[in-house]
Structure formats: C-alpha cells, structure tokens
Amino acid sequence: MLPRVRAWLQWPVLIVAILAGGEIAARLDDLVRYDVPFLAPLDVGYDLTVRDSTTIRGRPFGRFKKVRLNAAGFRGPTVTPAARAGCVRVAVLGASESVVGGEAAGTEYPALMQRALDGRGCFEVQNAALSGFDLPHLTVLWNQWVARWSPALVVVYTTPAFYLRPDAPTYPDPPTGRARKPKWWTPRLEDRAPGEWSLPEVVQKWIARRDIERAVAAHDAGWEYQEVPADRLARYQGDLDSLVVAIRGAGAEPILVTHAMRFADAMRPSDELELLKWQRGTRATGPVVLAFERAANAAMLALGRRRGVMVVDAAARLTGRQEWFVDYIHFTVPGRAVMGALLADSVAALAGRLPPTRALSDRVTP
C-alpha cells in the first residue's frame, strides 16, 4: 500500500516541477530576448499605461518586451514639449489597429508612415493610440494629454464597431485610484499558453456561435440588431464631430481615415470564422456589422466635406484585400506598409498647404 501512496505523491511533485521549469524558462527567454529582469513583474496593462487624475494614457518611458514608449508615453521618436523648429509633428489617435506588440512591435503603420516621410521633409510621428479606445476615450485623451504636445496634424483612425457593443461608448469619468504594480511572482508562463486561435477552425466556429447564441438568449427579443441602428450611427457621427472640433480648437488639423476590413462585398468561405469572431463582441448580426462599417465610413466622408477636413479613404484602398489583414480588422506587415505609405502621402500633401505659423517644415515635398 505504501509504495502506491508514494507513487501517487510523485505526480503532484512532477507537475509542480514541470510548471516551475516552464516559468523559469519563460523568464530566461524574456531576459535574453527583451532584456526583462528575471524577477521583474511583466504586465502589458501596467507597463504601458498609467492613470492620472484625468485620463488613462501611455506610461512615460513604458516598456513591455519589444515595445518602448517615449517621455510622453507615445510610440515614437524622442519627444519634447514642442516640435523642433521647422518640423511637422503628427499625432496618431486610434485603437488596437494602430498598435502592435510581440516581435512585430515597431512595425505599426504610424512607424512605417514615419519611415515613408523621412525623405520628404522634417516630420515627427507620435503614436498615441491605445487598445480599446473608442471616440469618447480618444477625445478625452486628446484634450487632457495629447494636445499638450502641440502636434500640427492629427491622424484619426477610429473603430466604428465599438458602437455595436452591448453598451454604447460614453465619455469616461476621471480614473479613480492608481493601478497596482503586479507582484514579481506573477506568472509569465500563462501568457505563452496556446489560446482559442490554436484550436481547429471548426471548433473555433462552434465556440463563437455558442457565445453569440448565449448573448442573444440572455436578452429580450429585439436586442440583436437586424439592421443598422440609426441611433448608434448618429452617436458615432456626433462623437467624431466632437473630436474634430476639439482638435481644431487646440490649433491642430485633423486627418480622418476611413476604417478598413478584410471583408469584400462578396464574402469568401475563409471569411466566415473572422466575421463570427467580430460579431461575437457586438449585439449585431454579421451582415449588420459589415453594413455599419460601410455606413460609418460614409458618415465620415460626409463629415469631412461638411467641415472641410481631409479624409483619407483607407477603406477604398485596403478593404477586401485578405492578404493585408491578420484577422477581421488588424493588419499584416504588408497591410501596415500600405497604410503607412497611404497616410504619408496625405500628411505630406496637407503639411505643404498649411501656413508656416503651424510649426511646419519649409522642406516639405508632397
């Protein structure tokens, strides 16, 4: 009997040893690849964002693996309160489509836009985008933080589908309390565990459909949008207009960018899973998600005409090009390069038309 007990006791010890070995290996990997101290905590939310009395923003000099933020908490070159004489400072406001982590950090489309602009005058691109930020959050971020750094131009690449979430975007209250720094023993091995994406496609589709059905069943009839919700679209238009007014009120000029997606007008079999994933975070059917995207882009173009704001039609250039998207809306490296080049052309053209009092370069060559 005793030998059997000893044999059973070996299993917990073995499991603990395997997990401990995996954790040690993960920390050594981070040390070698990213120069992260072995005993330091590693948390993307804490390491890259900070809460102050007015907003959530990028953490000054934040770093997470390959990501490095500057003194303003932006992804960009060294920054001072004002741009260098004769230089055009360009700020980018957006959500997760505008930032990249992991090994691809540094290949965000704003970084590639910077490279495309380097031979066309003195430009400084500062990427202030934060994952999950909708228009109200971006407006507060602009008013309370980004505007202080006096950009001349502001690229706005916002996510219309946020307006199809169960709760519509609202202007946030000031953050309460400071985020707590994670303990040094917070596991890093968990982040390396394979996620849902590693499952067979048929299983991923089943999970997505199950989640959608559960969400619909948990609400009254009519909760799921069967057509483009006029009130949500109007809210998007109003919030976008408010951001434009705020940017111009601070002395900068906005550049609006229509939102691109992988889905063409004619759906392909390979699109089914990605549309289910996108739909899962909303209260709309798949076709309505796509229709809302197109309606929001049309609304942005109309706003640009009404306000005299430059609108870059990225959707016309990138939408439907499956090879330029890693999922439903996030770009591959080639997609980011196309986006960066497209925006560089527009930024250079607009910079060449603005008066020199806006701290613009006299060497700009559209």
Name each region found by the language model.
Residues 146-155, 159:
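Proline-aspartate-enriched helix->loop->beta-strand connector
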Residues 89-93, 126, 154-156:
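Conserved beta-strand elements of the Class I
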Residues 121-147:
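A conserved hydrophobic secondary-structure block that centers on an alpha-helix together
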